[in-house]
Design a protein with these regions (language model features):
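Hydrophobic alpha-helical connector segments
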Residues: 1-16
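Short loop-to-helix capping motifs
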Residues: 13, 26-27
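Secondary-structure edge/capping motif, primarily at the C-terminal ends of alpha-helices
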Residues: 17-24, 56, 81-89
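Short, hydrophobic secondary-structure boundary micro-motifs
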Residues: 18-20, 33, 60-61, 120
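Residue-level recognition of alpha-helical structural elements
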Residues: 30, 63-67, 90-97
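Amphipathic alpha-helical packing segments from all-alpha helical-bundle domains
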Residues: 30-57, 68-83, 102-110
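C-terminal peripheral helix-coil segments that are non-catalytic and often amphipathic
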Residues: 83-126
């Protein structure tokens, strides 16, 4: 699935992600590029969430900025999942990709409509 491909890409560049904060502090050009890319991602996720709501896969927001903050959680997990895995396991391996992909997948589940939950189960064979 797409998320697993993305997580494998993160793993491939783990040398960067394990020292993410340091890299951002020490390299203004990389930081500027990252922040620009992050703004584009926010727009893309907002458009995705709106499409999923329109297609009755996701529910409407119940709280102000609920989906903006959901995206923020995805961003935090995406940026720091490797650090978490490294701390918890003393080493990092491709096996951690499945576990953290599941963390990302399941983060969306509470926001799904019944139709969305049925589709989720179908897609991920839960």
């Amino acid at each position: 699935n797409t998320l697993e491909v993305i997580m494998k890409g993160f793993y491939h560049y783990r040398f960067l992600l394990l020292d993410f904060v340091h890299v951002m502090r020490e390299n203004p050009n990389i930081r500027a590029h990252y922040l620009e890319m992050e703004q584009r991602r926010k727009v893309q996720f907002d458009q995705l969430f709106q499409l999923l709501i329109k297609n009755e896969i996701m529910r409407e927001e119940a709280l102000p900025n609920e989906y903006k903050l959901l995206y923020k959680r995805f961003e935090i997990i995406g940026n720091f999942w490797m650090s978490s895995a490294q701390i918890e396991n003393d080493s990092l391996s491709p096996n951690h990709i499945d576990e953290y992909s599941l963390v990302m997948h399941q983060a969306i589940y509470p926001y799904l409509t019944q139709k969305g939950k049925e589709e989720y189960v179908r897609l991920f064979s839960v």
